[in-house]
Amino acid sequence: MRNFIINRKIIFLTQSEKSKKAKVKRQKFGNIFTFYLLPFTFKSFAALRLCVFALILILPSFAQKIAILTPEKNGQSEKFAEKLTDSLSEKFKVLDSSLSETAFLSSNPEKPFNLTVEEAKIIGAAIGCEFFLLVRSENLRRYSFEKKEYFESFAAVYAVSSRTGRLVFWKLKTFNGYKSADAERLLFDSIADLAKEISGKLPNIAKEEFNEKVSKLEEIPDENSFEAKNFRSPLPYRRISPQYTAIANLYNIAATIDIEVDFDETGKILLTKIVRWAGFGLDESVTETVRKMNWRPATRNQKTLPIRVLLRYNFKKLEKEE
């Protein structure tokens, strides 16, 4: 039986709590990036939007700028990133790795493989790319009853949208061998197929995000605010804990998953968005669990109302006691 811990208490984050770190990040970069908007009439703005949409449809994917980063500095991660860069350069404009790395480090992400969407958007803006890829690769010694001692060479690739900050593509590639070099060779031989898969997905994601409509809903009010008076948050009738996935357990992943949930006035879930991601199946586990639960609607002065809430789940593997 796998040992892990998930906080069972559902944490509701208020708007001020959510935006506190984002404000600090934006202030940090506010002096670096300045954007000027020219006045547009409604018709000219609509025409401009149509032109931009047409350009997105007709421009080839190589016009999109991407950055490939290795937050964990080890030889295999850097070697994998170099080979992935070579494969993706045929379809995308891959930015200089040293410049991208400098911009990435300037944002000082505490957990680079467990970013919030706000942190990711700031990083993407600092780098100046449409997407950035985070690469983590290692060669591990494994043991099993069937194979006894063997080596596993793996690479986890995170593709992140600079526009939305969301994790839009995640892939784990693993290969085994009785020798370290054999496992590594098999992994590197798979890079061409991985690059092809990434090249097929990112341009389509860019089109989808451009057409995405953002709905506005009231959010959980601050505790001492006027809006909090006689307000009651939505709650599940029966709480369910999301599963700590087997793949997360195997790689000893500790992560926080934040999910934004839109409820209608009856407590029905309209939309869910992962706004702090981690990969390894944890995002999907949280989404599936939240959607399984039946929710009591939010109320103010005993009247039900639609609401947007932010829920947080913490995952951590527990080490076996000696």
Model-based region annotation:
Residues 1-9, 13-29, 38, 48-54:
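Short, low-complexity, charge-dense intrinsically disordered segments
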Residues 59-63:
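Sec/Tat signal peptide C-region and signal peptidase I cleavage site
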Residues 65, 154, 168-170, 179-192, ...:
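Charge-biased low-complexity segments
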Residues 65-73, 85-114, 223:
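Short beta-strand->alpha-helix linker/helix-N-cap micro-motif
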Residues 74-79, 179-183:
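Solvent-exposed loop/turn segments connecting transmembrane beta-strands
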Residues 77-85, 117-121, 191, 195, ...:
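Extracytoplasmic/secreted envelope proteins and their assembly/folding machinery
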Residues 95-144:
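Short, solvent-exposed, polar/charged sequence segments at loop or secondary-structure edges
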Residues 133-178:
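Amphipathic beta-strand/beta-sheet edge segments enriched in Tyr/Trp
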